[in-house]
């Protein structure tokens, strides 16, 4: 009886070590970016020229219920648009969401990631255009 048990135990150990485990590597998740329909935007679009010839486009959106206070902007940088919400700031205006932070100042503006990585710095407003939407 002891001989059979040890033989079965050894066989199970051998088969446990021999089996191939299919390990799948996790695929990197892509961030889903909210699509912004630029044709329907109302407000004022500013084009900022930044250091290293980077361009940032900022749309200060106006809606009927937000006419007095601008609560958000849409920032476009390198083909990606993000809707940023106004935050409290001592100097200038800060807009942010979970990914980006736009610091709007009188002299220079800056676009950063929320991890602190600078995407565009020393941005100066070049042109401004009115957007009427549809």
UniProtKB/Swiss-Prot annotation:
Query: What's the domain of life for this entry?
Result: Bacteria
Q: Which gene encodes it?
A: oapB
- Transmembrane segment boundaries: none
- Write down the species: Haemophilus influenzae (strain ATCC 51907 / DSM 11121 / KW20 / Rd)
Entries under InterPro entries matching the protein: MliC_sf (IPR036328), OapB (IPR012097)
Entry protein name: Opacity-associated protein OapB
């Amino acid at each position: 009886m002891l001989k059979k048990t040890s033989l079965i135990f050894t066989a199970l150990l051998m088969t446990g070590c021999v089996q191939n485990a299919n390990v799948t590597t996790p695929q990197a998740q892509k961030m889903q970016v909210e699509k912004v329909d630029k044709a329907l935007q109302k407000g004022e679009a500013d084009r900022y020229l930044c250091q290293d010839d980077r361009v940032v486009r900022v749309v200060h959106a106006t809606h009927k219920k937000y006419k007095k206070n601008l609560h958000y902007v849409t920032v476009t940088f390198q083909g990606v648009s993000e809707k940023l919400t106004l935050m409290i700031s001592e100097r200038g205006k800060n807009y942010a969401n979970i990914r980006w932070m736009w610091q709007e100042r009188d002299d220079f503006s800056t676009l950063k990631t929320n991890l602190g990585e600078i995407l565009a710095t020393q941005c100066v407003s070049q042109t401004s255009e009115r957007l009427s939407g549809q």
